[in-house]
């Protein structure tokens, strides 16, 4: 594990290293990741099968004990892993794809380790968030990552309403089977003509970057879902049972800045609207 970087920790105990892994292609793995996987003694993985597949794809013979670390076991496993760190054992933390702590429980282990005065460092690398932003062509100077939208229709509508006037570019993860509904909900809250980009299967063989307005993309997602050949056991497809396949990252443009130019009537939006509400100011004494 890395031993040359400084950290706010005390230096006692083991080191927690957050290791970014490829989001699609195994050969996107960095040389440093290959070296750390090969020499790790304890790996905490969101899905143990995925890290073993990655190691096999990279011709790495894992010597490490590999333990699972995902939402359902997070509370118990955080305490166990913290104990390992306090006993002086280094831990390599990996997620299914991309950077640990981004839309997964890894941040909880980081928080616990930092609170205990233990050293935390990172092995940087791929992230679907920044990759999607880069290929989207939408502004990247300011953005917000919103993770997976709420599943409940009411809660999802409230979240989208809160984001509708945010001028930052917004990035979401979404499951293929819910993509059409999410795009339709965003079109209703943000406006049908808001630009957006659907990034599907980033870096993989069937990568697809679909650009358009929210309304156009919602229609596209419905058509793709209806064309999905997956069927029920009896061979009859259920209405709405199809889905856009693959891992989805959705990038949505932020709200446009309101124009401060005079309109056809000579009024300046915002300024003249406010003056009509408060009336003329009294003269100075």
Description of each model-found segment:
Residues 1-71:
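Glycine-rich, flexible N-terminal cofactor/catalytic loop recognition
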Residues 2-3, 7-14, 89-90, 169, ...:
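A contiguous loop/helix-start segment that scaffolds small-molecule binding in enzyme catalytic cores
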Residues 37-43, 117-121, 169-170:
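Short active-site oxyanion
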Residues 45-46, 104, 173:
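Short beta-strand scaffold positions
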Residues 49-51, 98-99, 128, 178, ...:
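Alpha-helix capping/helix-boundary segments
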Residues 67-76, 149-152:
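Conserved helicase motor
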Residues 78-127:
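Glycine/small-residue-rich loop that forms an oxyanion/phosphate-binding "nest" at active or ligand-binding sites
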Residues 107-166:
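Class I SAM-dependent methyltransferase SAM-binding "motif I" and its flanking Rossmann-like core
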